[in-house]
């Protein structure tokens, strides 16, 4: 720095997410085992196993709090068991975020409704453990609006005007 100049704080360039170094089978294991753990927790009302499998940052939620968070799934009777046999489609391939967490988003294209997911994992003791989860059910594709009401047909016409009884002679 030159004498008489003021120090200037420079912004550090933001670190961009980078692809995760994980094979497809590893990704499928993480996604399926996580969603099945949630499915079992929702079906039994017991969230302790889901919590115990997760990272410490997720474990700040006790089992009762997790039951509150996922109460809507239980009310709707959400069944996630189909994730065992359907391959997920990824809208965001697994990537390492600047904070070191791995995130992936996508859906299982099941019919009549697809299962959408957003999962975040933390590296703990050499394993990826659940840090955040969002699961929702949505339509499998764009939904068309309802049919418009049937309009009354205008009276049929001919070149000479409205069609009616033949003229009297």
Question: What function would you assign to each model-found segment?
Answer:
Residues 1-42, 138, 145-167:
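Juxtamembrane and targeting peptides
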Residues 21-36, 40-101:
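Short solvent-exposed beta->alpha transition segments
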